[in-house]
C-alpha cells in the first residue's frame, strides 16, 4: 500500500482525449516544436487569464500535452490545463516580487517542446511581453556564447529572465574564463538578468559558487511537466504550492555534511508529494500511471506523488539561533536512483555529489550496472575542469585521480559506494536540451566495465 500525506486519498482518473481544448498544444521530446506557433496558441489558450492563480478551474479542458519519446522508459503524455500553466507562472512572478510598473521579458534558450521552454512562452503571454527566442531553439545550431549574446542584445526591457540547464551556464562561464574579451561580454549579459532559472539537472556546487562570485541571481529549480515546471526555487516552496515528505521503506541512508546519517528530529526525509493549482491533470490514456502518481483527498485537494526522495530541514533565521517558519527542500535523488550493491542501498545522487566535490571534477554521472557478484555495480563517469584536462592524457595521472575519487567515496559514504567502474570522459554526450544523455553514458560505462 502506498503511504500518503493525507489519509483516505483516492487515485485520480486519467484524462481522456475528449478533454483536449480544440487549440491544445501537443509536443514530444523527440519532435522539436515551433515556438512561434506555440506562442500564438498560448495567446488564445491563456487569453482569459491574468497573472492570477485564483482563476483556475478544475474541469477546464487540456491546453498543453507534454510527451516523452519513451527512449528511457514507457512514453507518457502529461496533460496540463491553462489554469495550471497560469498558476505556475503566477508563482514564479510572485517569487521575484512582481512589479506592476515593470513588465518582465523572457529569453527562450531551451527547446519549446520541454516544459521549461513551454513555460517561458506561457509566462511571456501572461506578462504581456514578447519573448526573445535564441537562434539555437529554431535553427540547426548549438547553444553557444555567441548565440546567447545575440539574443540578449535583442532584449528591450530591464526586468529580464532566462531558463537554462546547468550545462548551458557552465558553457558560458567556461568560455568567459578562456576568452577575456568574450568573458567581459558574457559576464555583463548574465549580470543583466533579474533572475536566471537553473533546472533540468542538478547543478554542481562549483557552478553555483562561480555564479555567486559573479553576483548572478541564479535560482535552482525543482519541478517537472507534472507540476507545470519548477515549483521549488532554491529550496523554497513557491507560493500556492504545498510539499509533504512521506517516509517509505527502502530509502537509502541520508548523509549529512560530514557523510554520517542525519538523525535530527527537525529534519523530515521521505518521498516528495506536491499539491497545488499548478498540477497536471494526469497522463492521457494511461489510467495505471495516473492512479500511481495522482491522488485526490475527500476535500477535493489533488496530490502528485513524485519519483523523488527529499529532505526538509528548518532554516536558521539571520543573526538568530531560531529557525524560520519555512523549511528548505533538498532533493536527494530519484527513487530509481537508489542502487543496491552487495545488499547495501546507495544513493546515486550522493555518490555524484561526492565526486563533484573534488576540485578536478567538473561533473559526474552515476549509474548501476548488472553484475554477477554485486547484483549492481556502481559506475561513474566524470568530466574534468579545464585546468585538469591538460594532464588527462597521462594514464598514470588518470589512475591516481580515480584512486583518489574512490577513496573519497569510501570515506564519505562507505566502501560499497566507491565506483567499481570510473571513466574519465572529455565531455558528456548531451540530449537536445543540453542535459547529459544518461542512456549514452550508461552504454559507455557498460562497455568500459565489460572490457575491464
Q: What residue ranges belong to the model's regions?
A:
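Hydrophobic alpha-helical segments in the ANL/AMP-binding
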Residues: 5-20, 92, 115-129
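Conserved C-terminal "lid"/linker of ANL adenylate-forming enzymes
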Residues: 339, 366-367, 379-381, 406-452
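Conserved AMP-binding A3 loop
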Residues: 63-90, 97
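Gly/Ser/Thr-rich phosphate-binding loop
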Residues: 174-235
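AMP-binding/adenylate-forming catalytic core of the ANL superfamily
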Residues: 300-302, 309-417
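Conserved ATP/PPi-binding loop(s) of AMP-dependent carboxylate-activating enzymes
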Residues: 251-295, 346
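AMP-binding/adenylate-forming
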Residues: 82-88, 105-171, 219
